[in-house]
């Protein structure tokens, strides 16, 4: 009996040593980096993936899985093996798409590594548009409900939610149009849409080129890249909404691997090349690890659920 116990404990110790060694050696092969959107998400995602490849010593390979306001990408990562070899390039959409009914789970169905950067969501119109302030646009929208068109990235996306918060907060009832990023900007210029809610850095180029103008931004503070543009809160809308980007993995990924990913993410985000590129794009670099990001997600999720409930678009998860 004593011999059997010795063999069992010996086997357990050997297995533990093997597992510890495997974690220590991670990563031993390329890592899939799942990107849920095109446009700015794709640009930023490929940049951080490349920077992380250098830190980890293995290829971090961008893979586009676009659709459902991030639902396809997050579902894919949720269902992946929890070994750290499949990473989601998350954004605020991890909170919006999970609360609007695009997926049957909430944001806690994945493990979250941390945040890389954040940016405000601007309300954009053509430079030729008749509105020069957000109030002018919203006053017309209230006077003519279901007439003015506002384009956004897709149902459940961060731009969708920012648009809902803004219009609902000012009693505006527009026609909301789900449109891809590049097409959204073309439609602004052609007049096919009256306005758009968008990521920050791409339309900022159009503003500087004199083709578009921002009427407001969603964040709690003015952005130094566009200091003359008021926040929605300054204009009387009770909202603070940032588009963040970071990393998530399958639930149950070993803590040792998550810690390695966090360290690699922060080191890559802080690298001279990546941080310089972010500065050039006017994106706020704001890396944070698992604990700080968990607190941010919890607070942001409460805010988003409140926005959705007020707008009547919140979808509770079915109890198991």
Label every model-predicted segment.
Residues 1-9:
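Bacterial N-terminal signal peptides that target proteins for export
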Residues 28-30, 168-172, 255-320:
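An extracytoplasmic/periplasmic, membrane-proximal ligand-sensing/linker region
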Residues 14-23:
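C-terminal segment of classical bacterial N-terminal signal peptides
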Residues 23-109, 147, 159, 167-195, ...:
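N-terminal (or domain-start) structured segment
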Residues 25, 52-54, 76-85, 98-183, ...:
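Hinge/capping helix and adjacent helix->loop/strand transition within the periplasmic-binding protein
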Residues 118, 202-270, 299-302, 316-320:
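C-terminal lobe and pocket-closing loops
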